[in-house]
Amino acid sequence: MSWQAYVDEHLMCDVGDGQGHHLTAAAIIGHDGSVWAQSANFPQFKPQEITDIMKDFDEPGHLAPTGMFLAGLKYMVIQGEPNAVIRGKKGAGGITIKKTGQSMVFGLYEEPVTPGQCNMVVERLGDYLIEQGL
């Protein structure tokens, strides 16, 4: 399966609410910031933003004082899992990032999709990639 198929079929899929809702945007990005695959509307991020996100995985809490930025938009960092998941909130939406052995799985959402639905979609694929050694 191509990386793009993972994004299209496993991240931009129905979130399982029975109403056809899905994430706003999604991507799989290497630890070095290279884009492996992304949805058409995934925001154009700055390399430093990915560097800062990777640093927060290595040093949990690094982003908490300043917030997390993606494409210049600021997300308030909320509860995550050290070295595994970063979650952010911005207005009626937010972001979930799951770190795997070689990549990061990004999911962005807006209401009516809930944070829990985004977490489930992103972390399910991330866990699968970890199981596959990726």
Curated annotation (Swiss-Prot):
Subcellular location: Cytoplasm, Cytoskeleton
SMART domains documented for this protein: PROF
Protein name: Profilin-5
Gene Ontology biological process terms in this record: actin cytoskeleton organization
Phenotype caused by lack of the gene: In germinating pollen grain, the double mutant prf4 and prf5 reduces the amount of F-actin and induces disorganization of actin filaments within the apical and subapical regions of the pollen tube.
Gene3D superfamilies, per the entry: Dynein light chain 2a, cytoplasmic
Tissue and organ distribution: Specifically expressed in mature pollen grains. Expressed in germinating pollen grains. Expressed in growing pollen tubes (at protein level).
Pfam families referenced in this protein's UniProt entry, alphabetically: Profilin
Source organism of the structure: Arabidopsis thaliana (Mouse-ear cress)
A single GO molecular function term of this UniProt record: actin monomer binding
Gene that encodes it: PRF5
UniProt family annotation: Belongs to the profilin family.
Cellular component terms per the entry's GO annotation: cytoplasm; cytoskeleton; mitochondrion; nucleus; phragmoplast
Subunit structure: Occurs in many kinds of cells as a complex with monomeric actin in a 1:1 ratio.
Keywords for the protein's UniProt record, in alphabetical order: Actin-binding, Cytoplasm, Cytoskeleton
Role this protein plays: Binds to actin monomers and regulates the organization of the actin cytoskeleton. At high concentrations, profilin prevents the polymerization of actin, whereas it enhances it at low concentrations. At low concentrations, associates with the poly-proline motif of formins to enhance actin filament elongation rate. Acts redundantly with PRF4 to regulate apical actin polymerization at the tip of pollen tube and control polarized pollen tube growth. Functions probably by favoring formin-mediated actin polymerization at pollen tube tips.
